[in-house]
Protein backbone atom coordinates (compact mmCIF):
# COMPACT_ATOMS: atom_id res chain seq x y z
CA UNK A 1 0.00 0.00 0.00
CA UNK A 2 1.26 3.49 -0.85
CA UNK A 3 2.19 5.69 2.08
CA UNK A 4 -0.72 7.89 3.24
CA UNK A 5 1.41 11.05 3.16
CA UNK A 6 1.91 10.51 -0.58
CA UNK A 7 -1.76 9.92 -1.44
CA UNK A 8 -3.92 11.93 0.98
CA UNK A 9 -4.78 15.31 -0.67
CA UNK A 10 -3.85 17.38 2.41
CA UNK A 11 -0.88 15.28 3.57
CA UNK A 12 0.46 15.34 0.02
CA UNK A 13 0.88 19.16 0.16
CA UNK A 14 2.72 18.93 3.50
CA UNK A 15 4.82 16.03 2.18
CA UNK A 16 5.91 17.94 -0.94
CA UNK A 17 6.67 21.06 1.12
CA UNK A 18 8.47 19.73 4.21
CA UNK A 19 9.27 16.00 3.89
CA UNK A 20 10.08 14.76 0.37
CA UNK A 21 11.04 18.24 -0.88
CA UNK A 22 14.29 17.96 -2.91
CA UNK A 23 16.77 20.42 -1.36
CA UNK A 24 20.33 21.33 -2.41
CA UNK A 25 22.88 19.27 -0.48
CA UNK A 26 25.12 22.24 0.36
CA UNK A 27 22.82 24.90 1.87
CA UNK A 28 24.41 26.44 4.97
CA UNK A 29 23.03 27.71 8.28
CA UNK A 30 22.09 30.97 6.49
CA UNK A 31 19.15 29.02 5.01
CA UNK A 32 17.78 28.35 8.53
CA UNK A 33 16.21 31.79 8.89
CA UNK A 34 13.18 31.05 6.70
CA UNK A 35 11.98 28.31 9.05
CA UNK A 36 12.93 30.43 12.08
CA UNK A 37 10.76 33.26 10.72
CA UNK A 38 7.86 30.81 10.41
CA UNK A 39 8.36 29.76 14.06
CA UNK A 40 8.59 33.45 15.12
CA UNK A 41 5.28 34.13 13.35
CA UNK A 42 3.59 31.22 15.16
CA UNK A 43 5.01 32.37 18.54
CA UNK A 44 3.81 35.95 17.89
CA UNK A 45 0.31 34.85 16.85
CA UNK A 46 -0.12 32.56 19.88
CA UNK A 47 1.26 34.99 22.48
CA UNK A 48 -0.66 37.85 20.81
CA UNK A 49 -3.90 35.87 20.95
CA UNK A 50 -3.55 35.35 24.72
CA UNK A 51 -2.66 39.03 25.21
CA UNK A 52 -5.72 40.10 23.20
CA UNK A 53 -7.94 38.12 25.60
CA UNK A 54 -7.03 40.55 28.42
CA UNK A 55 -6.23 43.78 26.56
CA UNK A 56 -8.71 46.65 26.16
CA UNK A 57 -8.27 49.05 23.23
CA UNK A 58 -9.48 52.18 24.99
CA UNK A 59 -7.32 55.22 25.78
CA UNK A 60 -8.49 55.24 29.41
CA UNK A 61 -7.80 51.56 30.14
CA UNK A 62 -5.18 50.35 27.58
CA UNK A 63 -2.15 51.18 29.74
CA UNK A 64 -3.67 49.73 32.93
CA UNK A 65 -4.85 46.60 31.05
CA UNK A 66 -1.23 45.90 30.04
CA UNK A 67 -0.16 46.41 33.68
CA UNK A 68 -3.01 44.06 34.71
CA UNK A 69 -1.75 41.40 32.26
CA UNK A 70 1.74 41.57 33.81
CA UNK A 71 0.55 41.59 37.44
CA UNK A 72 -2.68 39.60 37.71
CA UNK A 73 -2.94 37.21 34.74
CA UNK A 74 -1.33 33.78 35.19
CA UNK A 75 2.05 33.98 33.44
CA UNK A 76 0.86 37.21 31.80
CA UNK A 77 4.30 38.76 32.38
CA UNK A 78 5.89 35.87 30.47
CA UNK A 79 3.42 36.05 27.58
CA UNK A 80 3.95 39.80 27.26
CA UNK A 81 7.77 39.52 27.48
CA UNK A 82 7.81 36.74 24.88
CA UNK A 83 5.60 38.83 22.57
CA UNK A 84 7.65 42.04 22.94
CA UNK A 85 11.05 40.32 22.59
CA UNK A 86 9.66 37.91 19.99
CA UNK A 87 9.19 40.95 17.74
CA UNK A 88 12.90 41.77 18.10
CA UNK A 89 13.86 38.17 17.28
CA UNK A 90 11.48 38.29 14.29
CA UNK A 91 13.23 41.37 12.88
CA UNK A 92 16.70 40.01 13.64
CA UNK A 93 15.85 36.88 11.61
CA UNK A 94 14.22 39.04 8.88
CA UNK A 95 17.30 41.23 8.42
CA UNK A 96 19.60 38.19 8.32
CA UNK A 97 17.24 36.45 5.86
CA UNK A 98 17.22 39.50 3.53
CA UNK A 99 21.02 39.88 3.91
CA UNK A 100 21.48 36.22 2.95
CA UNK A 101 19.25 36.79 -0.10
CA UNK A 102 21.40 39.72 -1.24
CA UNK A 103 24.74 37.97 -0.56
CA UNK A 104 23.88 34.73 -2.34
CA UNK A 105 21.82 36.24 -5.19
CA UNK A 106 18.51 34.67 -4.10
CA UNK A 107 16.79 37.84 -5.39
CA UNK A 108 17.04 36.42 -8.92
CA UNK A 109 13.97 34.33 -8.04
CA UNK A 110 12.00 37.52 -8.72
CA UNK A 111 8.50 36.39 -7.64
CA UNK A 112 9.74 34.94 -4.35
CA UNK A 113 11.84 38.07 -3.72
CA UNK A 114 9.00 40.52 -4.48
CA UNK A 115 6.56 38.67 -2.21
CA UNK A 116 9.33 38.73 0.42
CA UNK A 117 9.62 42.53 0.17
CA UNK A 118 5.81 42.84 0.52
CA UNK A 119 6.06 40.55 3.56
CA UNK A 120 8.78 42.78 5.06
CA UNK A 121 6.58 45.87 4.62
CA UNK A 122 3.56 44.09 6.14
CA UNK A 123 5.58 42.90 9.15
CA UNK A 124 6.90 46.46 9.65
CA UNK A 125 3.33 47.83 9.53
CA UNK A 126 2.20 45.18 12.04
CA UNK A 127 5.06 45.99 14.42
CA UNK A 128 4.36 49.73 14.18
CA UNK A 129 0.63 49.47 15.01
CA UNK A 130 1.47 46.94 17.75
CA UNK A 131 3.91 49.33 19.41
CA UNK A 132 1.10 51.88 19.80
CA UNK A 133 -1.18 49.49 21.76
CA UNK A 134 0.33 49.73 25.30
CA UNK A 135 -0.50 53.49 25.11
CA UNK A 136 2.67 54.61 26.87
CA UNK A 137 4.44 57.90 26.14
CA UNK A 138 6.59 56.52 23.30
CA UNK A 139 3.58 54.60 21.89
CA UNK A 140 1.51 57.79 21.66
CA UNK A 141 4.25 60.10 20.38
CA UNK A 142 5.60 57.47 17.95
CA UNK A 143 2.10 57.11 16.49
CA UNK A 144 1.71 60.90 16.32
CA UNK A 145 5.05 61.51 14.58
CA UNK A 146 4.85 58.64 12.07
CA UNK A 147 1.17 59.06 11.09
CA UNK A 148 1.79 62.81 10.81
CA UNK A 149 4.22 62.05 7.95
CA UNK A 150 1.17 61.33 5.77
CA UNK A 151 0.34 65.04 5.90
CA UNK A 152 3.50 65.66 3.81
CA UNK A 153 1.74 64.14 0.77
CA UNK A 154 0.66 67.05 -1.45
CA UNK A 155 -3.04 67.97 -1.65
CA UNK A 156 -4.51 64.84 0.05
CA UNK A 157 -2.00 64.56 2.94
CA UNK A 158 -3.98 66.22 5.74
CA UNK A 159 -7.21 64.42 4.76
CA UNK A 160 -5.32 61.11 4.68
CA UNK A 161 -3.78 61.67 8.14
CA UNK A 162 -7.17 62.56 9.66
CA UNK A 163 -8.71 59.52 7.96
CA UNK A 164 -6.09 57.24 9.58
CA UNK A 165 -6.56 58.96 12.97
CA UNK A 166 -10.36 58.80 12.85
CA UNK A 167 -10.43 62.41 14.06
CA UNK A 168 -8.23 65.48 14.27
CA UNK A 169 -5.48 63.84 16.36
CA UNK A 170 -4.27 60.45 17.63
CA UNK A 171 -7.00 59.39 20.06
CA UNK A 172 -9.41 56.58 21.02
CA UNK A 173 -10.50 55.92 17.41
CA UNK A 174 -6.84 55.57 16.36
CA UNK A 175 -6.05 53.09 19.15
CA UNK A 176 -9.14 50.96 18.39
CA UNK A 177 -8.37 50.70 14.67
CA UNK A 178 -4.67 50.03 15.32
CA UNK A 179 -5.69 47.11 17.55
CA UNK A 180 -7.94 45.83 14.74
CA UNK A 181 -5.05 46.15 12.24
CA UNK A 182 -2.61 44.49 14.64
CA UNK A 183 -4.98 41.55 15.06
CA UNK A 184 -5.74 40.98 11.36
CA UNK A 185 -2.31 41.65 9.78
CA UNK A 186 -0.53 38.51 11.13
CA UNK A 187 -3.13 36.35 9.37
CA UNK A 188 -2.54 38.29 6.14
CA UNK A 189 1.20 37.69 6.72
CA UNK A 190 0.47 33.96 7.09
CA UNK A 191 -1.31 33.94 3.71
CA UNK A 192 1.61 35.82 2.11
CA UNK A 193 4.06 33.31 3.62
CA UNK A 194 2.18 30.50 1.85
CA UNK A 195 2.43 32.43 -1.46
CA UNK A 196 6.15 33.07 -0.73
CA UNK A 197 6.71 29.30 -0.26
CA UNK A 198 4.59 28.49 -3.32
CA UNK A 199 6.86 30.60 -5.55
CA UNK A 200 9.99 29.26 -3.83
CA UNK A 201 8.96 25.64 -4.44
CA UNK A 202 8.37 26.42 -8.13
CA UNK A 203 12.12 26.98 -8.56
CA UNK A 204 13.64 25.19 -5.56
CA UNK A 205 16.12 26.73 -3.14
CA UNK A 206 19.21 28.63 -4.17
CA UNK A 207 22.52 27.52 -2.63
CA UNK A 208 25.79 29.19 -1.50
CA UNK A 209 27.66 28.49 -4.76
CA UNK A 210 24.86 30.03 -6.87
CA UNK A 211 25.10 27.25 -9.47
CA UNK A 212 22.20 24.98 -10.51
CA UNK A 213 21.86 22.34 -7.74
CA UNK A 214 19.53 19.96 -9.64
CA UNK A 215 22.25 17.35 -10.12
CA UNK A 216 22.74 16.95 -6.36
CA UNK A 217 19.61 17.10 -4.21
CA UNK A 218 18.68 15.44 -0.90
CA UNK A 219 15.27 15.04 0.82
CA UNK A 220 14.34 17.85 3.21
CA UNK A 221 13.49 15.32 5.94
CA UNK A 222 15.46 14.20 7.96
CA UNK A 223 18.48 16.30 6.91
CA UNK A 224 17.09 19.83 7.04
CA UNK A 225 14.36 19.17 9.62
CA UNK A 226 17.13 18.28 12.09
CA UNK A 227 19.16 21.29 10.99
CA UNK A 228 16.13 23.58 11.43
CA UNK A 229 15.44 22.04 14.85
CA UNK A 230 18.97 23.00 15.95
CA UNK A 231 18.36 26.56 14.68
CA UNK A 232 15.09 26.60 16.63
CA UNK A 233 16.94 25.62 19.84
CA UNK A 234 19.30 28.59 19.39
CA UNK A 235 16.36 30.93 18.68
CA UNK A 236 14.46 29.77 21.78
CA UNK A 237 17.61 30.02 23.90
CA UNK A 238 18.14 33.68 22.91
CA UNK A 239 14.42 34.54 23.14
CA UNK A 240 13.97 32.95 26.58
CA UNK A 241 17.21 34.49 27.87
CA UNK A 242 15.94 37.91 26.76
CA UNK A 243 12.38 37.41 28.02
CA UNK A 244 13.37 35.96 31.41
CA UNK A 245 16.55 37.82 32.36
CA UNK A 246 16.38 41.18 30.60
CA UNK A 247 12.87 41.68 29.18
CA UNK A 248 12.99 45.49 28.99
CA UNK A 249 16.51 45.96 27.62
CA UNK A 250 15.28 46.54 24.04
CA UNK A 251 12.30 48.73 25.01
CA UNK A 252 12.11 52.43 25.81
CA UNK A 253 11.88 53.61 29.46
CA UNK A 254 9.41 56.33 28.37
CA UNK A 255 6.84 53.63 27.61
CA UNK A 256 6.49 52.94 31.34
CA UNK A 257 4.70 56.30 31.62
CA UNK A 258 1.06 56.51 30.44
CA UNK A 259 0.48 58.53 27.24
CA UNK A 260 0.29 62.26 27.89
CA UNK A 261 -0.46 64.54 24.90
CA UNK A 262 0.67 67.59 26.93
CA UNK A 263 4.18 66.29 27.62
CA UNK A 264 6.55 65.52 24.73
CA UNK A 265 9.42 63.06 25.47
CA UNK A 266 12.91 64.60 24.92
CA UNK A 267 13.82 62.02 22.22
CA UNK A 268 11.04 60.44 20.19
CA UNK A 269 12.36 57.24 18.61
CA UNK A 270 10.89 53.92 17.43
CA UNK A 271 12.00 50.40 18.40
CA UNK A 272 15.58 49.43 17.41
CA UNK A 273 14.50 47.59 14.24
CA UNK A 274 13.11 50.80 12.69
CA UNK A 275 16.02 53.06 13.66
CA UNK A 276 17.88 52.70 10.32
CA UNK A 277 14.80 53.94 8.40
CA UNK A 278 14.16 56.64 11.03
CA UNK A 279 17.75 57.90 10.62
CA UNK A 280 17.23 58.16 6.83
CA UNK A 281 13.93 60.00 7.41
CA UNK A 282 15.62 62.52 9.73
CA UNK A 283 18.70 63.00 7.54
CA UNK A 284 16.67 64.97 4.96
CA UNK A 285 15.64 68.44 6.21
CA UNK A 286 12.50 68.48 4.01
CA UNK A 287 9.37 66.67 5.29
CA UNK A 288 8.20 65.22 1.96
CA UNK A 289 11.78 64.40 0.94
CA UNK A 290 12.27 62.53 4.22
CA UNK A 291 9.09 60.49 3.70
CA UNK A 292 10.16 59.57 0.14
CA UNK A 293 13.65 58.59 1.36
CA UNK A 294 12.06 56.48 4.13
CA UNK A 295 9.94 54.60 1.58
CA UNK A 296 12.86 54.29 -0.85
CA UNK A 297 15.07 52.73 1.86
CA UNK A 298 12.76 49.67 1.87
CA UNK A 299 11.39 49.72 -1.71
CA UNK A 300 14.95 49.83 -3.10
CA UNK A 301 14.95 46.06 -2.43
CA UNK A 302 12.46 45.65 -5.29
CA UNK A 303 14.95 46.91 -7.89
CA UNK A 304 17.95 44.88 -6.64
CA UNK A 305 17.22 42.04 -9.17
CA UNK A 306 17.38 44.63 -12.00
CA UNK A 307 20.80 45.86 -10.82
CA UNK A 308 22.48 42.43 -10.96
CA UNK A 309 25.30 42.75 -13.49
CA UNK A 310 27.66 39.90 -12.49
CA UNK A 311 27.99 36.68 -14.48
CA UNK A 312 28.02 34.74 -11.22
CA UNK A 313 24.90 34.60 -9.08
CA UNK A 314 26.39 34.36 -5.61
CA UNK A 315 28.99 36.64 -3.99
CA UNK A 316 30.84 33.55 -2.73
CA UNK A 317 33.66 33.95 -5.28
CA UNK A 318 33.40 37.73 -5.82
CA UNK A 319 35.71 39.51 -3.33
CA UNK A 320 34.98 43.08 -4.54
CA UNK A 321 31.21 42.61 -4.17
CA UNK A 322 31.78 40.91 -0.81
CA UNK A 323 33.70 43.95 0.45
CA UNK A 324 30.88 46.28 -0.68
CA UNK A 325 28.30 44.00 0.95
CA UNK A 326 30.03 44.20 4.34
CA UNK A 327 30.42 47.98 3.96
CA UNK A 328 26.64 48.05 3.34
CA UNK A 329 26.09 45.99 6.51
CA UNK A 330 28.32 48.30 8.58
CA UNK A 331 26.51 51.29 7.05
CA UNK A 332 23.09 49.96 8.14
CA UNK A 333 24.41 49.33 11.67
CA UNK A 334 25.72 52.93 11.70
CA UNK A 335 22.28 54.21 10.61
CA UNK A 336 20.65 52.14 13.39
CA UNK A 337 22.97 53.79 15.92
CA UNK A 338 22.34 57.29 14.48
CA UNK A 339 18.55 56.77 14.62
CA UNK A 340 18.76 56.44 18.40
CA UNK A 341 20.84 59.62 18.87
CA UNK A 342 19.53 63.18 19.35
CA UNK A 343 19.28 65.49 16.31
CA UNK A 344 22.53 67.43 16.77
CA UNK A 345 26.04 67.50 15.34
CA UNK A 346 28.01 65.32 14.64
CA UNK A 347 25.09 62.84 14.39
CA UNK A 348 23.28 64.84 11.68
CA UNK A 349 26.23 64.80 9.24
CA UNK A 350 27.04 61.12 10.01
CA UNK A 351 23.39 60.20 9.29
CA UNK A 352 23.35 62.17 6.03
CA UNK A 353 26.67 60.64 4.89
CA UNK A 354 25.48 57.11 5.74
CA UNK A 355 22.18 57.69 3.89
CA UNK A 356 24.01 58.87 0.74
CA UNK A 357 26.48 55.96 0.97
CA UNK A 358 23.59 53.47 1.30
CA UNK A 359 21.98 54.57 -1.97
CA UNK A 360 25.38 54.84 -3.71
CA UNK A 361 26.33 51.29 -2.68
CA UNK A 362 23.11 49.69 -3.92
CA UNK A 363 22.45 51.79 -7.03
CA UNK A 364 25.98 52.47 -8.32
CA UNK A 365 28.90 50.70 -6.63
CA UNK A 366 27.57 47.13 -6.45
CA UNK A 367 26.43 47.00 -10.12
CA UNK A 368 29.83 48.47 -11.15
CA UNK A 369 31.62 45.87 -8.99
CA UNK A 370 29.72 43.14 -10.85
CA UNK A 371 30.86 44.52 -14.23
CA UNK A 372 34.44 44.85 -12.96
CA UNK A 373 34.45 41.21 -11.75
CA UNK A 374 33.11 40.07 -15.15
CA UNK A 375 35.99 41.91 -16.82
CA UNK A 376 38.56 40.37 -14.43
CA UNK A 377 37.25 36.86 -15.17
CA UNK A 378 37.73 37.22 -18.94
CA UNK A 379 40.88 35.53 -20.29
CA UNK A 380 43.44 38.21 -21.19
CA UNK A 381 45.41 36.22 -23.76
From Swiss-Prot:
* Gene (name only): MT-CYB
Question: Which cofactors, if any, are listed as required?
Answer: heme b
The entry marks the following residues as binding heme b b566, namely 97, 196
As for what it does, the entry says: Component of the ubiquinol-cytochrome c reductase complex (complex III or cytochrome b-c1 complex) that is part of the mitochondrial respiratory chain. The b-c1 complex mediates electron transfer from ubiquinol to cytochrome c. Contributes to the generation of a proton gradient across the mitochondrial membrane that is then used for ATP synthesis.
| Subunit structure comment from the entry | The cytochrome bc1 complex contains 11 subunits: 3 respiratory subunits (MT-CYB, CYC1 and UQCRFS1), 2 core proteins (UQCRC1 and UQCRC2) and 6 low-molecular weight proteins (UQCRH/QCR6, UQCRB/QCR7, UQCRQ/QCR8, UQCR10/QCR9, UQCR11/QCR10 and a cleavage product of UQCRFS1). This cytochrome bc1 complex then forms a dimer.
Q: Where are the transmembrane segments?
A: 33-53, 77-98, 113-133, 178-198, 226-246, 288-308, 320-340, 347-367
Give GO BP annotations, semicolon-separated.
mitochondrial electron transport, ubiquinol to cytochrome c
InterPro entries, alphabetically? Cyt_b/b6_C (IPR005798), Cyt_b/b6_C_sf (IPR036150), Cyt_b/b6_N (IPR005797), Cytb/b6-like_sf (IPR027387), Cytochrome_b (IPR030689), Cytochrome_b_C_euk/bac (IPR048260), Cytochrome_b_N_euk/bac (IPR048259), Di-haem_cyt_TM (IPR016174)
Which family does the record claim for this protein?
Answer: Belongs to the cytochrome b family.
What's its membrane topology?
Answer: Multi-pass membrane protein
Query: Where is a ubiquinone annotated to bind?
Result: 201
Q: Entry's SUPFAM superfamilies?
A: a domain/subunit of cytochrome bc1 complex (Ubiquinol-cytochrome c reductase), Transmembrane di-heme cytochromes
The record's GO molecular-function terms, alphabetically, read: metal ion binding; ubiquinol-cytochrome-c reductase activity
Principal location listed in the UniProt entry: mitochondrion
What is the name of the protein in this document? Cytochrome b
Location comes to:
Mitochondrion inner membrane
One Gene Ontology cellular component = mitochondrial inner membrane
Sites binding heme b b562 sit at: 83, 182
User: Beyond the main fields, what else does the record say?
Assistant: Heme 1 (or BL or b562) is low-potential and absorbs at about 562 nm, and heme 2 (or BH or b566) is high-potential and absorbs at about 566 nm.
Keywords, sorted A to Z: Electron transport, Heme, Iron, Membrane, Metal-binding, Mitochondrion, Mitochondrion inner membrane, Respiratory chain, Transmembrane, Transmembrane helix, Transport, Ubiquinone
Q: How is the cofactor bound?
A: Binds 2 heme b groups non-covalently.
Amino acid sequence: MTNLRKTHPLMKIINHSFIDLPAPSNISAWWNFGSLLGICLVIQILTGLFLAMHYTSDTLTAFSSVAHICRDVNYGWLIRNLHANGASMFFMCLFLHVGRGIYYGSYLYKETWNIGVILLLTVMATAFVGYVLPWGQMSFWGATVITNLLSAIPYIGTTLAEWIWGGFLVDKATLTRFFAFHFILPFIIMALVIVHLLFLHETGSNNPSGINPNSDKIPFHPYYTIKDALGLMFLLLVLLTLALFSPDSLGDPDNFSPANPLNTPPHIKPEWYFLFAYAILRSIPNKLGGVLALLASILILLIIPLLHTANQRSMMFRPVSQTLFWILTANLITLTWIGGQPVEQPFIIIGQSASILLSMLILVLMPLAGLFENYMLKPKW
